[in-house]
Structure formats: C-alpha cells, structure tokens
Amino acid sequence: VHECVVLWLTAPPDAPRSRKVTTHVELIEDFQAARPRLLSLAHRILGSLHDAEDAVQTTWIRARTADWAAVDNPEGWFTTVTARLCLDQLRARDRRGELPLLAESIPDAELAADEEFLRREDVSRALLVLLGRLTPAQRVAYVLHDLFAVPFDQIATVLDTAPANAKKLASRARLRLGAPGAEPRETAGHARIVDAFLAAARGGDIDRLVALMAPGVVRTVDPRLVREGAATEVLGARQVAEETRYFADRIHASVPMLVNGGPGAVIAPGGHPLACLRFAIADGRIARFEITRFRPDDSVRRFSDLP
C-alpha cells in the first residue's frame, strides 16, 4: 500500500466470528454483530450514511429469506451482499452524473448526519473526497481490500470478475489516491502555512490569521457561496481575518489539499466536496486566496508533506 494511503486508514470494527447459521435467533445475533462493520464498509464505499444504512437494511431483508444451509460463512455473505448493493448504487449515481457526490445535492439533515458519523468514526475527510474520484469498481475494490482486508477472490465475486482483475482495480485506485505527481519545489512549506491558516480560522484566532497573511492580501469568493449582499472581495489582512468568522462553520469541515496544482483546501462537510480554497503564497505569507464552488473536474490531491 502506498505510504500516503496508509496514513488514511482507520481500523474498522472487528469482524465477527463466522459460524453455520441453524436458527433464526443465530441469524439475528450474527447480523447484529456484523452490522457496525457493514455500516462502516458501506459508508466508505458510498460516502453517505443515509445510503449506507439503506444498503445494510436491504442486506438484512435478503438475509431473512436466504438459504442458510448452503452458507458456511455468514459474515462473508453479509459483506458480499452489502458490497454488491453499494456497487449498484455507485453505478446508478454514475449513470445519473452524480459522481462525485457533492454537498450541494444533499439535504441538510443528511449532510449533518454524515458529518457527525465522519467525526464519530474518525474517517479521513481527505480520503472521502479522493474516493469520489474513483470509478465504482475501483472504489469497491480499494475499500474492501485496503480498508477492510477482504480477499480478492471474494472481491471478484462482488465485482463479477476474476481475482486478478479485482487486484488490478485496487492497484489502479491506490495509484490514483496516492501518486504524488509533480509537485513544485516551492510548495514544500506551503502545506504548513495552509494548515496553520485553517487552524487559526477554526479557532477564531484573528491575530494569528493576520500574521499568516501579507498586509495587502486579497480574498475573493464566489457570490453563490455567501449571503446576499455580502462582499465578494475583501482587501487587507485585518479585514480578511475578520471576514473568516462568516465561514467558521465551513472551515471546520475543511482539509488542506493541493487544488488544481496549487496550495489550497477543500471544504467537505460530511466528506462531500462543497468549495475549494486556493492560496497564492509569497515570501512565506498568503498574498491572495479565492473561495470557489467545487467542480467535478477540479484536480485535488493530498499534500505530500502533511500527514
């Protein structure tokens, strides 16, 4: 696994021990034991708690009518069915042009639930943003193998392909997620400047924000991202720092990233991209930054020098 990708992994809930199901009570017990892991798995694949809960619930409905006499590994059966349902959902989104799943297309209540789940489960916000760039098959193969240690022969069953092809899909996903690409030498310290800016903005530290920006800094913002009548361009370090208070709730859902090749951040409540910040940095200070709506064709990746 690529070094950058390893840093994103969080330990999923332990998989329950498998046993031959002989009674309905045993089926209920095994499913309840597996449910936290299934929900975590479905959330990583779909990026939506609402959709993940639907997938897990559908798995239970199918489990109630399955022929358990022919199943030797209930936990594996639950995983396979859940993953197939998730794959179907991703492919349906792809056909509708809904990949990646953007924040603006999600109801506020679902977005809040996604944000709470992301923080409770300690899911990497950057990873969810980047997973949205993968094809459905790549995302399923990567999540199952690299995050949940599902063997490739089982993944092949989910994807209806050969194990070798499943392995290639996971490998391609890994490359897309972790390949550092060409990074300008001068950006070596930019990641920490962006990280410090976001930390100060989250904490409301106006003096620290002023210190991180050039005196004549200019901040521009897409008018669709601010309330009606709000200034779309602000000039001066103190004025820009004061203005960040209006974006405090969004800054809490931000992660430093390279945006279209330059230093920036992605605001992604619940892991769903909403907006991009792009910074122009000169002499160790932020000289200009812009806030724009996230577009599906925006190029985003991790800073190589941030954990």
Where are these regions (language model features)?
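Active-site-adjacent scaffolding segments
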Residues: 16-54, 58-197, 205
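Low-complexity, intrinsically disordered terminal/linker segments enriched in charged
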Residues: 292-307
